[in-house]
């Protein structure tokens, strides 16, 4: 069975591009949502292997780090990962309890694909 990914806050350009990558490379099913409330509702339904959160949510400009905090505080046992090229944002996400993520500049790198795959299989 493939990986199930919850993708939070990507824009209309990056979201479909990332979804296609995960589907092609990881045989993943990707659900895209646009807010922390949506993410929490989807997580409660279960079945996800990993949550990817954009640093800035495209729909309203809110902080992906705040989304990560909410998800972690909710008690989820699903690994949460920040999508950001900014090292300081990655550091803050890890401090909040997330797994160190990746930036879009390295999106198609084999190491990024492997990171998502290995994290989702934890």
Locate the predicted segments by residue:
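Alpha4 helix (beta4-alpha4-beta5 surface) of REC/receiver domains from two-component response regulators
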Residues: 84-102
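Hydrophobic/aromatic docking surface of two-component receiver
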Residues: 105-107
């Amino acid at each position: 069975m493939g990986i199930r990914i919850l993708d939070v806050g990507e824009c209309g350009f990056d979201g479909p591009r990332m979804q296609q990558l995960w589907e092609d490379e990881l045989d993943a099913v990707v659900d895209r949502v646009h807010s922390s409330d949506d993410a929490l509702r989807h997580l409660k339904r279960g079945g996800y292997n990993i949550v990817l959160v954009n640093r800035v949510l495209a729909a309203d400009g809110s902080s992906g780090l705040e989304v990560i905090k909410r998800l972690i505080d909710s008690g989820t046992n699903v690994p949460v990962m920040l999508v950001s090229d900014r090292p300081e944002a990655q550091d803050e996400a890890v401090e909040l309890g997330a797994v160190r993520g990746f930036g879009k500049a390295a999106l198609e790198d084999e190491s990024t694909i492997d990171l998502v795959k290995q994290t989702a299989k934890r």
